[in-house]
C-alpha cells in the first residue's frame, strides 16, 4: 500500500518523479523504484516526503483513507523506542514474539526499543500485521495541526 500511496500522492500533487527526486535529493530512477516497490524507501526519505507535503504516515501506509494535517515529524529515536515498548507491553507481547513475527533478530528489535536505531519501513510494515489498531503517526509522537 505504501508504494501505491507514494505514487497516488505525487500524482494528486501534480508532480513529476524528477520533482520528487529533487526535493529528496535522489535520482528519478530511485523515486520510480519506491513507487513500484522495486526499492524500499528509507525511513528518513519517507519522513522528508511526509514533511514536505504534509502527509500522514498512517495515510501513506494505508492505515487510514483520511490524510490528517500533522506537525512535521522530528526524529526522536528514544521517544519512538519508548512508544514501541509501551505498545508491546499494552498488547502483552514479548520482544521475542514481535521479532519472530516480523522476521528480524531480537537484538535488532531491542535496538529499536532502546532508541539506538531509527525504525525501518520494513519493520513498520511488520508491526502493522501484529497490532490492530496501530498508528505510525502516534508512534512518532506527531501532533495534529
Describe each model-derived feature in a short phrase.
Residues 25, 44-59, 122-138:
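DNA major-groove recognition helix of helix-turn-helix/homeodomain DNA-binding modules
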Residues 35, 45, 61-64, 113, ...:
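DNA major-groove recognition helix of helix-turn-helix
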Residues 11, 22, 51, 89, ...:
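Alpha-helical residues within the helix-turn-helix
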